């Protein structure tokens, strides 16, 4: 396979694959390792982040909220109970913003070297999205998906159980961006479907490897 997730599942014995994926041999994608649905079968302790908040407020807005609450702390109990958490929010927002900017810089470099006009335009769109989100509120469907992916992937990288991140009610927090883009002529249904497919392909690459004694 072209990614670790595909190679990992294909390397499993057939009996092991069907233990996880079930006896339905018509489920070729799951059984052969072509794709692994994210947050479906891995663990019972799944949860969903507040993706709507990162899409609508951005890291800058969340950071400002945390800083305001830090400034307002005046009780000794809150210094112990709340201050470390709020400081962690500020650090996390800064780290996530820095991480996204690195992707923006990389996409810009790749676009400068790209000779294919279509791919060059795609890379420029990726660079523009990564330069804006998740630091700032999402303005388009593409930016909303990009911000959502940064948020969930940051959690996946931070801890092992981050692999069980649920997507939550995507229909609710993504629809306003989709509707606005379609109404204003920036997006077609086919383009939105392709962007969602790209998101799912990225999620399928998140495969856990657990060592056994």
Question: PLM features: residue spans?
Answer:
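Catalytic cofactor-binding cores of redox enzymes
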Residues: 1-213
């Amino acid at each position: 396979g072209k990614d670790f997730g595909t190679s990992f599942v294909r390397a499993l014995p057939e009996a092991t694959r069907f233990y996880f994926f079930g006896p339905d041999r018509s489920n070729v994608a799951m059984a052969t390792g072509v794709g692994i649905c994210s947050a479906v079968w891995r663990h019972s302790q799944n949860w969903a982040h507040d993706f709507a908040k990162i899409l609508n407020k951005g890291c800058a807005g969340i950071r400002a909220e945390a800083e305001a609450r830090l400034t307002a702390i005046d009780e000794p109990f809150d210094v112990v109970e709340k201050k470390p958490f709020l400081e962690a929010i500020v650090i996390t927002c800064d780290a996530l913003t820095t991480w996204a900017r690195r992707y923006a810089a990389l996409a810009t470099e790749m676009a400068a070297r790209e000779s294919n006009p279509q791919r060059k335009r795609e890379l420029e769109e990726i660079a523009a999205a990564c330069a804006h989100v998740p630091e700032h509120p999402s303005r388009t469907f593409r930016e909303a998906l990009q911000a959502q992916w940064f948020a969930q992937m940051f959690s996946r990288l931070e801890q092992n159980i981050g692999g069980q991140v649920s997507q939550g009610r995507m229909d609710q927090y993504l629809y306003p961006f989709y509707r606005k883009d379609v109404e204003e002529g920036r997006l077609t249904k086919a383009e939105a479907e392709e962007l969602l497919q790209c998101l799912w392909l990225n999620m399928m690459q998140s495969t856990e490897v657990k060592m056994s004694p």
